[in-house]
């Protein structure tokens, strides 16, 4: 029967909660009954004395003063009444003082005139009507006639007098004969109980908020007619029939037209009213003791009736029924297992084993029913989610929807996907719990049987050996299924952690959260390794059990004794077909068993190899985990060390900045003082001519040895100045353009020397080849590349020529350059050779008068070595340029030395197992066009995000470590063949 059909069949049934009317703690309740003359009904008031005492005691402890009147049963404060409660007493027709001494001393509990006199009644016998409506009053009875009568009744709710009135306890039943004596005892006991008692230390008083919320739970009130009280009596008698003779006899009420003519309520004297009030009060007390407060309060005051408090859903009831059946099956198995201690004979033990098998089958059936019922809602949710997602997908593909509708459908699809995922997780958890119950029961039965094996010998135990093998197989199978269910759950958790790691966003706590997730992942991975070890262990136990059973069968087949008819020879026996067939069948059966045993041995060997593989993976995982922790600690230590060093560096930097600021400040002050001094005392400025300054510098250079760097920078300036002088016609004075040219040349020389110094040797040669021909300084500065900055003044007119020294011997001719294989190499070589020739020509074109000062500064060997280095650089550059064999082939093709031979295209035979859809070359031959990829997309794909974002880099590193620690290569291994327990 389906669950939907069960719901429809049981829709008219209700489930009542068990022990719903049990009271957690006993409370003391007091009933006060009085007669309302305005409505002609009984006014019944009930007070919870225990709650009132707790509230008043907590108020005293909280420091809020409470008067005596606040603790009285009829106090307005006790019931949440207003100050107008006193006026409501005028509407009550209370009985006069009783003749008994007890009533004279204590006053009537029902009387409103015990301490306060009633106002005089009018001619009609009715007092003033009070507008008060008690907030603590509940609905009087389910048999109320109309809402208007309830409003009228509420206006005349009785308010009992002040505290001196002793309430009547509802503990005893007062009979008609001994009413007075019993009443005296009850009143005295109540007075003793009403004395203020200190609260025990264990009882903590409620707070003020709880007091306000529970104010309406201390008192209840209502108006009841004779008919209402009879209906209440019928309901109480249906609960307990002992109350049938206890209801007092009420006078007959007129009905129909008589109510219009003679009024609704019968005329009664004060003595009759007092007697009825007293009897009704005693009746209510007896009903409280018999039926309990919950039933009585719900019958009298039904305002706080909550159906959820009494009824429970049918699904919960059905689940409890399944659980009770499961508990009974568990207890049955436990009882049978306990009987093993007293059994001594093998026959009784075999009978007990049969009973255990039946009990376990009933346990498995009860467990299956329970968990099938628990799984059904999650299965329905999964199916509903899948169906809804499929509908959303079809709607998005086929319908013409706007962007907002598409966005809402996508959100709904994500919501249904999440619900389906949660349902799958719940199904997996319930599956694990199911197999835990069955595996635990099987394990208990198997352990008990192993303990029984020690009591009996091998011969007697042979009768139970087959059952023990079956039990071992069943235990291994149940444990294997439980472990595989756990493995699926752990894999789901791992997948969820990995997705959370990949979806982390930037933030202050992102790195810490990533570390926590990685740690959780490692813990889950270790748990997964343990579960996988248990799985392999169970598989090994299954194989071992099968091997043992097969070996036992083989030994039984071999030891089996077969009796044949007598024959003279073996050939004669084999001549008969039946005998030959039986012998061959036995041999074939033995061969099959032996082959199966060998297969099981091979599978067990593979399981052992896989266990070793998992053990190594587990060690790698632990090592990675420790390595991560060590890296974290090391990074923290390095950060601390670097932080201390950085602090020291920052301090030194601050000190240097302060010193430099102080120096610059002092320098500025000095300059300001000099400026003010010059402004205050202006003096005569003397300017020296250029010729005098150059002569002075020459005398200074001849007097003191000049460093090589200054010589290197001064020589080109002098040479260029002399050349300009000769070109200008040997004039005695230079124009502004002529004086500016040497300065520009000096600047060009400085920049070229800096470029040469900042580069390696081959670029230096290239740069030197690009300089103007008249400058030979790059060749000279390449010998000693040190930075130097020399300020050079404009050159004076040329000096008279001096006899030149003998010229240096000419350098040896350079070796012939190899033939360039490409345009770039030949162009570079030709350029460098021309630059070298220009340099030599410029050196030769320098007049002898100009080379006189440089004779004692340079040696010719330096120039020769510079030329050699330049040529070696050019040769090395050409070798690097033509080192590619493809360049040689292209150069030879240009020269026409050989021609290429046309080769026919080879067609490779296709692989037998390869499909054309997987071969990109075959697809291209068929005419499939390739998609053009833009360079920007490639550039974006090759950009490494981990280098730019530290969080992304950390996520990639964590995923890499996780991949190394996880057994992701299991799929590449040879998988175990599917076994019968996996089906």
Curated annotation (Swiss-Prot):
> What does the tissue specificity note say?
Widely expressed, except in testis where it is expressed at low level.
Q: Where is the composition biased (Low complexity)?
A: 77-94
Would the keyword DNA damage turn up in this protein's UniProt record?
yes
Please list where the region (Disordered) is annotated. 50-167, 723-855, 962-983
Which cysteines pair up through disulfides? They are: none
Sequence ranges of Pro residues compositional bias: 158-167, 794-818
Q: How does it sit in the membrane?
A: Lipid-anchor
Keywords linked to the UniProt accession? Actin-binding, Coiled coil, Cytoplasm, Cytoplasmic vesicle, Cytoskeleton, DNA damage, DNA repair, Lipoprotein, Membrane, Nucleus, Phosphoprotein, Ubl conjugation
Pfam families from the UniProt entry: JMY, WHAMM-JMY_N
Q: How is it modified after translation?
A: Ubiquitinated by MDM2, leading to its subsequent degradation by the proteasome. In case of DNA damage, the interaction with MDM2 is altered, preventing degradation and allowing interaction with p300/EP300 and its function in p53/TP53 stress response.
Q: Which GO terms describe its cellular component?
A: autophagosome membrane; cell leading edge; cytoplasmic vesicle; cytoskeleton; endomembrane system; nucleus
The residue ranges flagged as biased composition, category Acidic residues, are: 967-983
One GO biological process this protein is involved in is: cellular response to starvation
SUPFAM superfamilies named among the record's database cross-references: Formin homology 2 domain (FH2 domain)
Q: Where is this region: Interaction with p300/EP300?
A: 1-119, 469-558
Which terms in the Gene Ontology molecular function aspect does this entry carry?
actin binding; microtubule binding; transcription coactivator activity
Record localization = Nucleus; Cytoplasmic vesicle; Cytoplasm, Cytoskeleton; Endomembrane system
What region holds the WH2 domain?
916-933
Q: Outline the subunit composition.
A: Interacts with p300/EP300, the complex activates p53/TP53 transcriptional activity. Interacts with TTC5/STRAP; the interaction takes place in the nucleus and facilitates the association between JMY and p300/EP300. Interacts with TTC5/STRAP; the interaction takes place in the cytoplasm and results in the inhibition of JYM's nucleation activity. Interacts with MAP1LC3B; the interaction results in the activation of JYM's nucleation activity in the cytoplasm.
The record's note on its domains: The N-terminal region is involved in actin binding and actin nucleation activity.
Family statement: Belongs to the JMY family.
Q: What does this protein do?
A: Acts both as a nuclear p53/TP53-cofactor and a cytoplasmic regulator of actin dynamics depending on conditions. In nucleus, acts as a cofactor that increases p53/TP53 response via its interaction with p300/EP300. Increases p53/TP53-dependent transcription and apoptosis, suggesting an important role in p53/TP53 stress response such as DNA damage. In cytoplasm, acts as a nucleation-promoting factor for both branched and unbranched actin filaments. Activates the Arp2/3 complex to induce branched actin filament networks.
Protein name in the entry: Junction-mediating and -regulatory protein
Q: Which organism is it from?
A: Mus musculus
């Amino acid at each position: 029967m389906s669950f939907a059909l069960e719901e429809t069949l049981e829709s008219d049934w209700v489930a009542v909660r068990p022990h719903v009317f049990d009271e957690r703690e006993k409370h003391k309740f007091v009933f006060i009954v009085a007669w309302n003359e305005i409505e002609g009904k009984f006014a019944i008031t009930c007070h919870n004395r225990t709650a009132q005492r707790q509230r008043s005691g907590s108020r005293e402890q909280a420091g809020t003063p409470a008067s005596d009147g606040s603790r009285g049963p009829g106090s307005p404060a006790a019931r949440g009444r207003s100050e107008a409660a006193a006026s409501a007493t005028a509407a009550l027709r209370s009985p006069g003082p009783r003749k008994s001494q007890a009533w004279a001393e204590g006053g009537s509990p029902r009387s409103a005139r015990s301490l306060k006199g009633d106002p005089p009644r009018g001619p009609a016998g009715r007092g003033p009507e009070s507008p008060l409506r008690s907030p603590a009053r509940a609905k009087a009875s389910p048999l109320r006639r109309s809402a208007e009568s309830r409003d009228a009744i509420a206006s005349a709710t009785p308010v009992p007098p002040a505290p001196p009135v002793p309430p009547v306890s509802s503990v005893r039943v007062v009979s008609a004969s001994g009413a007075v004596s019993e009443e005296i005892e009850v009143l005295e006991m109540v007075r003793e109980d009403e004395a203020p008692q200190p609260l025990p230390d264990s009882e903590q008083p409620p707070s003020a908020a709880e007091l306000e919320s529970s104010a309406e739970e201390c008192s209840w009130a209502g108006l009841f007619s004779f008919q209402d009280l009879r209906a209440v009596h019928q309901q109480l008698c249906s609960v307990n029939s002992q109350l049938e003779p206890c209801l007092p006899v009420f006078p007959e009420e007129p009905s129909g037209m008589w109510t219009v003519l003679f009024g609704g309520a019968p005329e009664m004297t004060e003595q009759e009213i007092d007697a009825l009030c007293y009897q009704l009060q005693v009746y209510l007390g007896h009903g409280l003791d018999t039926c309990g407060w919950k039933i009585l309060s719900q019958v009298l005051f039904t305002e706080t009736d909550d159906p959820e408090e009494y009824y429970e859903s049918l699904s919960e009831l059905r689940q409890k029924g399944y659980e009770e059946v499961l508990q009974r099956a568990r207890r049955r198995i436990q009882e049978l297992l306990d009987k093993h201690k007293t059994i001594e004979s093998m026959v009784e033990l075999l009978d007990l084993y049969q009973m255990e098998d039946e009990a376990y089958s009933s346990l498995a059936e009860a467990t299956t029913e329970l968990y099938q019922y628990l799984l059904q809602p999650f299965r329905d949710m999964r199916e509903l989610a899948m169906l809804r997602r499929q509908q959303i997908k079809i709607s998005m593909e086929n319908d013409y929807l706007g962007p907002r509708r598409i966005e809402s459908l996508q959100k709904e699809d994500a919501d249904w996907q999440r619900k389906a995922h949660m349902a799958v997780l719940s199904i997996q958890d319930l599956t694990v719990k199911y197999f835990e119950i069955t595996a635990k029961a099987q394990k208990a039965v198997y352990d008990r049987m192993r303990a029984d094996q020690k009591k009996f010998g091998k011969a007697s135990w042979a009768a139970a050996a087959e059952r023990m093998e079956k039990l071992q197989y069943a235990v291994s199978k149940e444990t294997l299924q439980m472990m595989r269910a756990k493995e699926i759950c752990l894999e789901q958790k791992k997948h969820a952690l990995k997705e959370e790691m990949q979806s982390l966003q930037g933030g202050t706590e992102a790195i810490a959260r990533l570390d926590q997730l990685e740690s959780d992942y490692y813990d889950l991975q270790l748990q997964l390794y343990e579960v996988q070890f248990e799985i392999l262990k169970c598989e090994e136990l299954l194989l071992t059990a099968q091997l043992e059973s097969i070996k036992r069968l083989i030994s039984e087949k071999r030891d089996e004794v077969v009796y044949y008819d007598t024959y003279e020879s073996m050939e004669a026996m084999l001549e008969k077909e039946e005998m030959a067939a039986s012998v061959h069948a036995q041999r074939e059966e033995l061969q099959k068993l032996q082959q199966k045993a060998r297969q099981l041995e091979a599978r067990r060997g593979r399981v052992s190899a896989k266990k070793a593989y998992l053990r190594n993976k587990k060690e790698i995982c632990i090592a990675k985990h420790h390595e991560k922790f060590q890296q974290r600690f090391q990074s923290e230590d390095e950060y601390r060390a670097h932080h201390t060093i950085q602090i020291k560096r920052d301090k030194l930097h601050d000190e240097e900045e302060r010193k430099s600021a102080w120096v610059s400040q002092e320098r500025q002050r000095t300059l300001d003082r000099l400026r003010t001094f010059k402004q205050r005392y202006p003096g005569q400025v003397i300017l020296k001519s250029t010729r005098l300054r150059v002569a002075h510098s020459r005398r200074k250079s001849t007097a003191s040895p000049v460093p090589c760097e200054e010589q290197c920078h001064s020589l080109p300036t002098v040479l260029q100045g002399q050349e300009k002088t000769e070109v200008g016609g040997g004039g005695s004075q230079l124009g502004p353009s002529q004086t500016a040219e040497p300065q520009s040349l000096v600047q060009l020389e400085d920049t070229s020397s800096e470029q040469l110094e900042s580069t390696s040797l081959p670029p230096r040669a290239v740069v030197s080849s690009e300089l103007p021909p008249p400058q030979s300084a790059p060749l000279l500065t390449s010998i000693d590349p040190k930075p130097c900055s020399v300020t050079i003044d404009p050159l004076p007119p040329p000096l008279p020529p001096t006899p030149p020294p003998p010229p240096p011997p000419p350098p040896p001719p350079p070796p012939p350059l190899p033939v360039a294989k490409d345009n770039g190499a030949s162009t570079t070589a030709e350029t460098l050779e021309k630059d070298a020739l220009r340099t030599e020509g410029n050196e030769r074109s320098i007049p002898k008068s100009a080379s006189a000062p440089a004779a004692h500064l340079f040696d010719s060997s330096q120039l020769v070595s510079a030329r050699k280095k330049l040529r070696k650089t050019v040769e090395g550059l050409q070798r690097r340029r033509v080192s590619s064999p493809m360049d040689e082939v292209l150069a030879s093709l240009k020269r026409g030395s050989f021609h290429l031979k046309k080769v026919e295209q080879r067609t490779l035979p296709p692989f037998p197992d390869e499909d054309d859809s997987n071969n990109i070359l075959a697809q291209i031959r068929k005419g499939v066009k390739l998609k053009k990829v833009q360079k920007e997309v490639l550039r974006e794909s090759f950009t490494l995000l981990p280098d730019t974002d530290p969080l992304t880099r950390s996520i990639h590193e964590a995923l890499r470590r996780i991949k190394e620690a996880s057994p992701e290569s299991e799929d590449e291994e040879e998988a175990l063949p599917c076994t019968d327990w996996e089906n």
